[in-house]
Amino acid sequence: MADQQHLAVLKQGVAAWNAWRRQHPEILPDLSEADLSEADLSGANLRRANLMRANLSHAYLSEASLDEANLREADLTGANLREALLLRADLRQASFRQVNLIGAQLNGAQLSGADFRGADLSGGSLSRTGLHETDFSEANLSKVVITRKW
């Protein structure tokens, strides 16, 4: 369950959130199971945040930093993650259906069991990712950099 204080700061907007993150770098935000559907989190620093089972459907996360974040079982259906950073993120069993991931960096991420059906990952990077049972049906993988998995 999400920490209500963390949610309250996030709801003040990205500028307030990012300032709070700079002031409290030791805190690992807990936004697990939060309903952030349709939220505008573009450019947000969500690095190392716990977003497990969060509802981020149709959220705007372009250029957000989600490095090392826990998005396991999160719903990101229809979200915009254009040029987002998801380096070493835990994305296992998350739903990325119809998501805009153009130019997103997912290097080192764990994608096992994730659903990327119909997603656009063009121009992004999936180097050294765990892809076991990941569904890329009808996804756009043009110009994606994919090197050996772990």
Where are the regions a protein language model picked out?
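Tandem repeat scaffolds
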Residues: L7-A8, A16, R21-W150
